[in-house]
């Protein structure tokens, strides 16, 4: 390849890569929109269709293990953490992975019941494409991911809640 073509080829490759990321975010945004509607309407079937419960429970288990197995933690706490992380994460998942719990999280971030749910293009603009093919949403454009979605058999499903776990509370 001659030196003149190298910058042109690089620009073309970057353009193609950006187009893929945009298509990915637009595709994901349709399912994210459906999840937001399910949360707002307390639609358990639609919510479950857009949530990977097993992945979220695994994440809870990992967080429990990270805390209980941390350096300096006493042996009793480590043993209890190792023995109870999986059953506790399953129980917590049953209680917390529900539309009304995620509605409380949405309200914390400013989405009230009377707030219009953004359309697919607005959601796509708020999503960040991740190097591993997933997408995530952050409170601020350059901020950390709060929730992450993965394409599972053609449906973008919530696979990770990266925000503060203390926000996941049963409604009172």
Q: How should each PLM-predicted stretch be described?
A:
Residues 28-49:
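Post-signal peptide N-terminal segment of mature Sec-exported envelope proteins
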Residues 51-128:
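Short solvent-exposed beta->alpha transition segments
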Residues 21-24:
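Bacterial signal peptide processing site
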Residues 16-19:
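C-terminal motif of bacterial Sec signal peptides marking the signal peptidase cleavage site
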Residues 1-9:
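Bacterial N-terminal signal peptides that target proteins for export
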Residues 93-172:
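Exposed beta-sheet edge and beta->alpha loop/turn motif
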